[in-house]
Amino acid sequence: MSLKLMAFVCALLLLCTLTHVLSAATTVRPYKFGFTIDEQQHRAEKRDERGIIMGEFGFITADGIYHVTVYATDEEGKFRIISMKSYPYAGPVGSKSVPVTTTPKVLLPAAPVALPKYNFNSEACSGCFLKKSPPKTEIRTLSQPLAPVQPGKPDGSSDIGLNVQLPFRESIAQTVASRLGLLQDTLQTSNTNTNAPNTKTIELGLNIAMSTYYTTKNAVTGHVSTQTSNSQTPSANTKIDYNVGVVEKASPPVYRPLNIRLNEDVMRQAITYGNTIPGHVPLPNQPLVETSLLPASQVKIFALDGNAKVPLASNIQSVAQHPNAGLNAKVPLASNIQSVAQHPNAGLNAKVPLASNIQSVAQHPNAGLKNINRSGVSSAKTLANTKTRPPHTFNPHQTPLLSSATAPGISGVTANTPTGNVPSNGGGIAAGKAPGNPQAGGSGGIIGAGAPGGRKVSAGGIGSGSAIGGVSGGSKASGNGGAIGSGSAIGGGATGSKASGFGFGSNIGGGVSGSKPSGFGSESKIGGPDSGSKALGFGSGSKIGGGITGTKASGFGGEIGSGRGSASSATGDLYKFKYILDYNGHEETGGRNGDKQGSYFAIGEDAVQRTIEYIANEFGFQPHVSWRKLDAKEALPEENSLKHYEFKWFNQE
């Protein structure tokens, strides 16, 4: 009995113990916690004896908005969101000012609480840089709108886009007119003033060429509409209106097949004609004009008969020395001045030899000039082999070229000899000492020879001055060009010398690096050598003449395209753009030959302005980088606003 009672009591105690343990395991323990990260986020939560949890959390986004969410659970443990609020964050609350004493004093207002440092104004994002400036919602374009077209004002003068004058209009018109046989008269002579072709014939060829161009464009694109003004007006402007992107809901267009075949010979002739057009020399690059010793009233060319064909400026001296000569005769070139001066009785109807034939004429004064049939550009090799080259046609309004071989040229111009010694040449031009007094440059001298550096020499020639002369480094060449004007007729100096030459109106000139050339014509179309060279070059435009940098070659011009004198016939600027902002900018000028020149800059966060000046041509992109630390006084604006914008197309003159 007692054992059973003991067992029952033990079981009851065990049951009570288990019940207590189980009840202790399911007992709800209340808690409370919370934390706050200043100006970023906060969290708070608590649980009561019934097991209900209540809490909230909040965070500040990058746009300065405080988002607070309040949540709670019911007795069953289900999670519910009580409220969600968003309001601007104003920073922590400042402490109130408490008066020190109880004496009646006016309480000072509490100091305004400064806004926190990170009061950002931007859209919320994750991992992005925060901006202090308010977001910009307006649309700002860099380009300025075009001015509205006025109905009463013609739009032909606009130079925007493809409304510019096409550079190949003249070449196409000239080619078509030549194919039609309308320019036969202009191709007969090489150095005479001929009548320009009729305007109607040129306009006819121009209309044919432009109609071919537009027909080809329409056949290729199919959506280009052309507007051509009246073809009878000589100054009619032609414009092209591109309607690219305009979708028409009509039936699909049917394009005509391209059955136009271009003549390759015609295109080559057009390119050749375009290359003969000299380019305009910018005003800063034009050489200075030497003052003339003769007033305009004494220049005999202005007293000629009005019906006569006026010779070019390079023929002034020959006309002045032969006022009674027939004006219908072919006036010799500037290179023939000396031979004409030595043979005043020779008929001007004869073809006067070029500079390469001067010595042979001087040695045979009785030989008839009619037997010499050489014309164009003669070289020393051609003279040695007694071969002729076909005549070269010049533009009537273009200065004739004065050229010879690339071999050592006229004596007095040193070649490959820094001391001034002139090598022997087989071109028939006297080298070294000339007849007469070569050191003093007597009047009987044919072509003076230059002397070594340190001496002052006057080369003999026409009149009292020198016709052709030159000196080596350190010396000075001087002389009078006879009736042409002051200075020698043709002259050049090496590095460090002072060369004077080329009377007024002459288109021949040249100087080398370190020299001081003077006496060029009103518009010098013939460039000298490149920087650092000692080469002399004579020719038309920048295509002929010149020497390679660093060389000491001399001679008149050399062959066409020799040295670095050759360049594309397209000159002048094609476009220009420029835009400047507070922190960056870019400007560039593009030429018609493809060259580009400009600069751009950018200011970084380190207050350093980086500027890149560049030139891009056939040699590649050539930049020059520079840095500049901005001053503390140069306050940087908050916004990168546009200050200047410009874009312009240039018409071809």
Curated annotation (Swiss-Prot):
This is Protein lethal(3)malignant blood neoplasm 1. Residues 425-448 are annotated as: Disordered. The gene is l(3)mbn. GO terms for molecular function: structural constituent of chitin-based larval cuticle. Residues 433-568 are annotated as: 7 X approximate tandem repeats, Gly/Ser-rich. GO terms for biological process: chitin-based cuticle development. Residues 307-348 are annotated as: 2 X 21 AA repeats. One of its GO terms (cellular component) is chitin-based extracellular matrix. The keyword Cytoplasm applies. It comes from Drosophila melanogaster. Required for differentiation of the phagocytic blood-cell type, the plasmatocyte. Residues 439-448 have a biased composition (Gly residues). Residues 28-91, 572-640 form the Chitin-binding type R&R domain. Sequence repeats lie at residues 307-327, 328-348, 433-455, 456-475, 476-497, 498-515, 516-533, 534-551, 552-568. It comes from the Eukaryota. PANTHER family: CUTICLE PROTEIN (PTHR10380), PROTEIN LETHAL(3)MALIGNANT BLOOD NEOPLASM 1 (PTHR10380:SF119). InterPro entries: Cuticle_Struct_Prot, Insect_cuticle. It is found in: Cytoplasm; Cytoplasm, Perinuclear region. Keywords: Cytoplasm, Repeat. The keyword Repeat applies. Blood cells and other tissues.
